[in-house]
């Protein structure tokens, strides 16, 4: 089991290596791992004979904290899972709680949540595909997209007050309403992203070295991908047409028009192609929404659940009482078992919650998508070259904060 993978475990298992074989540590502190991940790899020359993955270096007991924190407080933990696209985590948790409480939010809230979700998805895919190019020596390609990533971060920072740990959304609505130039700036970002994505796509797909390092590398069949629990772009790259936004719609995803890109062999190349097309589809979704954001309130009228606005708390006794009760006594969720899944940037992010009607959950379990990808890493790289393992790891988009949770 994972917790048994100590130095003694590896010393015992690999003490009688065949002549010419070496044991190599890829991580836990290595640029190619993009986080605190450890892969112990047995190689013969440059060929990988065996590999084992070790997790837990940044385990922070989030599920246990979920049993101590109130439903509002746990939102800060979701920030620190997949920290590349935190609003997607925030929205997933809030939707789970709203499902438990059968809360309906105004349409304005849903529109803004969807726009921010797709902007966050684009950021995540820029990081994943851009860093893959860097790992393979194609540094300049990433720079074509990072300028636009920064523009998206500026929008998110203006809206939420933070770039990474956004703590975006509240039970029943948003933390605050969108700012006056929000629509204009989102449209400008989308306009600039379109040619940048095509240029980046051209830089990689017309590069023989990139194609040689990714085509047919780290592939997985559709059957094995399903068996390992793959979801998201990695599953679709293997040829499986499954996207929570289409197959189990939430928010207003059933009311917008977009396509689901599907790969064939689940290789590094096809994972990259799927993510590039998903960026185009995210822009398509945003453009259908941004001009139609309805007017109206940016939160439901729920004194028992929605934290009141600060200026009202400071000037109105009734609002101060509501604020005190929500902070001190928490939001009371009906007893029962609930599961809510959303399509995060790297796959199906699910929250399983057991409530006993108290201010804190009795049990919280997070279905983090990259946990399942990492279990398959040894199978993907076995028999391949050591250099190819770096590309494979990068294309899986394993985020250490989410993996260990």
Curated annotation (Swiss-Prot):
Reply yes or no: does the keyword RNA-binding apply. Answer: no
Matching entries from InterPro entries are given as: NADH_Q_OxRdtase_suD (IPR001135), NDH1_su_D/H (IPR022885), NiFe-Hase_large (IPR029014)
Q: Does the keyword Transport apply?
A: yes
Disulphide bond pairs: none
Q: Where is the signal peptide?
A: none
Q: Keyword annotations for this protein?
A: Cell inner membrane, Cell membrane, Membrane, NAD, Quinone, Translocase, Transport, Ubiquinone
Domain of life of the native organism:
Bacteria
Q: Name one GO cellular component term.
A: plasma membrane
Where is the chain membrane-spanning? Answer: none
Q: Which Pfam families match?
A: Complex1_49kDa
Enzyme class, UniProt record, top EC level: translocase
Q: Which GO terms describe its molecular function?
A: NAD binding; NADH:ubiquinone reductase (non-electrogenic) activity; quinone binding
Localisation: Cell inner membrane
Q: Which EC number(s) does UniProt give?
A: 7.1.1.-
Catalysed reaction, written as an equation: a quinone + NADH + 5 H(+)(in) = a quinol + NAD(+) + 4 H(+)(out)
Family per record: Belongs to the complex I 49 kDa subunit family.
Purpose of the protein? NDH-1 shuttles electrons from NADH, via FMN and iron-sulfur (Fe-S) centers, to quinones in the respiratory chain. The immediate electron acceptor for the enzyme in this species is believed to be ubiquinone. Couples the redox reaction to proton translocation (for every two electrons transferred, four hydrogen ions are translocated across the cytoplasmic membrane), and thus conserves the redox energy in a proton gradient.
Do you know which PANTHER family this protein is assigned to?
A: NADH DEHYDROGENASE [UBIQUINONE] IRON-SULFUR PROTEIN 2, MITOCHONDRIAL, NADH-UBIQUINONE OXIDOREDUCTASE 49 KDA SUBUNIT
Official protein name in the record:
NADH-quinone oxidoreductase subunit D
**Natural source organism:** Leptospira interrogans serogroup Icterohaemorrhagiae serovar Lai (strain 56601)
Gene that this sequence comes from: nuoD
């Amino acid at each position: 089991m994972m917790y048994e993978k100590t130095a003694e475990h590896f010393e015992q298992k690999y003490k009688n290596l065949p002549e010419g074989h070496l044991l190599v540590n890829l991580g836990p502190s290595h640029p190619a791992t993009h986080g605190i991940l450890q892969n112990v790899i047995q190689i013969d020359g440059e060929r990988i004979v065996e590999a084992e993955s070790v997790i837990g270096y940044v385990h922070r007991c989030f599920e246990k904290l979920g049993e101590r924190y109130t439903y509002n407080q746990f939102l800060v933990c979701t920030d620190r899972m997949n920290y590349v696209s935190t609003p997607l985590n925030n929205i997933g948790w809030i939707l789970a709680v709203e499902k438990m409480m059968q809360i309906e939010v105004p349409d304005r809230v849903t529109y803004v949540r969807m726009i921010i979700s797709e902007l966050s998805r684009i950021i995540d895919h820029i990081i994943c595909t851009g860093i893959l190019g860097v790992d393979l020596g194609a540094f300049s390609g990433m720079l074509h997209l990072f300028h636009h990533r920064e523009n998206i971060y500026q929008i998110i920072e203006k809206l939420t007050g933070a770039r990474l740990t956004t703590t975006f959304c509240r039970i029943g609505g948003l933390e605050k309403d969108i700012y006056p130039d929000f629509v204009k700036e989102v449209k400008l970002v989308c306009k600039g992203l379109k040619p940048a994505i095509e240029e980046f796509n051209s830089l990689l797909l017309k590069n023989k070295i990139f194609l040689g390092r990714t085509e047919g590398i780290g592939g997985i069949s559709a059957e094995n991908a399903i068996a390992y629990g793959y979801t998201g772009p990695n599953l679709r790259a293997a040829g499986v047409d499954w996207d929570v936004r289409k197959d189990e719609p939430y928010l207003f995803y059933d009311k917008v028009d977009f396509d689901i890109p599907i790969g064939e062999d689940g290789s590094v190349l096809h994972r990259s192609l799927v993510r590039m097309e998903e960026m185009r589809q995210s822009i398509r979704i945003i453009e259908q929404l941004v001009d139609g954001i309805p007017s109206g309130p940016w939160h439901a009228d729920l004194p028992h659940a929605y934290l009141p606005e600060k200026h009202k708390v400071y000037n109105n006794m009734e609002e101060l009482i509501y604020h005190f009760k929500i902070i001190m006594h928490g939001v009371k969720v009906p007893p029962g078992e609930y599961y809510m899944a959303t399509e995060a940037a790297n796959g199906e992010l699910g929250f399983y919650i057991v409530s006993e009607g108290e201010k804190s959950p009795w049990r919280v379990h997070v279905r983090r998508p990259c946990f399942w990808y990492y279990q398959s890493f040894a199978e993907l790289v076995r028999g391949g070259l050591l250099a190819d393992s770096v590309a494979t790891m990068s294309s899986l988009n394993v985020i250490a904060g989410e993996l260990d949770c």
